[in-house]
């Protein structure tokens, strides 16, 4: 499908249907609007490339999910509000901020694989060599290039793939947790999770459900982190449920 530009050319994406969008889909880190092609077919919907991904230009400054939500918010002005926000992973971080910032415009959320909270049991400490490198850098013993080399070696796949301002944004975002936003959301939320999600384990979804005023958690057996592409019809079922509640 053809790409269209939005928000004065700062965002690009694909529209589904001919009427104003009632569903807005926000993809994960390193992904694109294409992830939602199967789950949005036949709807009046919009799937965008978030700033810095696909063909949408990167932001001009470093910030977290709240900043990204403000960059995406103009999309709501062309929609048939209240909309259903669909957020996968990084896109879900934005969705909870949008629900807090523009509550009247959001009629429901469908979230999948979103690191909404820090893990109950944090992963192991960084490699000893990397920890030592950070300490030496802080003392001025090694330069920025040396530390960057260690980050490239020991950082996550997303970190290694990012560069420039997008890498700084990633570092900001992965340290965020959204207890405040979850408690403030009044719109109903469907949490659709793969039981094999190791990027945002199901225990995060269960704890998030307890913080939300109106939430439903569905676990998908044998499904990984990438629900939009590995289980698009399960995602569509949740979208249809939220749309039905708006009618």
Spans of features found by a protein language model:
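Conserved HGGG/HGGXW glycine-rich cap/lid loop of the alpha/beta-hydrolase fold
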Residues: 12-55
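Active-site loop/oxyanion-hole signature of alpha/beta-hydrolase fold enzymes
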Residues: 47-86, 237
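Gly/Ala-rich beta-loop-alpha elbow adjacent to hydrolase catalytic centers
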Residues: 87-91, 95
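Flexible "cap/lid" loop of the alpha/beta hydrolase fold
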Residues: 96-100, 105-139
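Hydrophobic, aromatic-rich cap/lid helix
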Residues: 152-180
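Short beta-strand/loop motif that positions the catalytic acidic residue
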Residues: 184-185, 191-193
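Acidic catalytic loop of the alpha/beta-hydrolase fold
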Residues: 196-200, 225
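Catalytic histidine-centered segment of alpha/beta-hydrolase-like enzymes
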Residues: 223-236
